[in-house]
């Protein structure tokens, strides 16, 4: 059985970059993980990324940063097809998780976007999750979460 001490921002960032199914094992009580960096999906690492908080995990941007980022057109996250706009992967699923206090204000890439999650391309699905006190940028389209 895991403990809250093992559930860190660094562990989340590494797990998201690796891809696959990520099930948090932080013990029996609710836990808040303060993200010290944005977790970025690496497009070429796998077709599926699932974050499952089991209903007990909150990822917090601490009012300082975006929590999750997936962009099929960002060369730093590696292209997997000649036309990044039409890519059907990766498939990011956020389930049984709370994303709180994410902040994208001041972000300029791709017109800003959501405070909790930025998604361009691929597929994105939310299941039984909450978004609380996230701040999107005022630039660009009025979208994002």
Residue ranges of model-derived segments:
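Acidic Gly/Asp/Thr-rich repetitive segments characteristic of extracellular carbohydrate-active
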Residues: 1-23
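Extracellular beta-strand-rich solenoid/capping regions of secreted or surface-exposed proteins
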Residues: 13, 18, 34-50, 58-95, ...
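N-terminal carbohydrate-binding/catalytic regions of secreted carbohydrate-active enzymes
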Residues: 26-34
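Outer-membrane beta-barrel translocator domains and adjoining extracellular loop/strand segments
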Residues: 109-110, 139-142
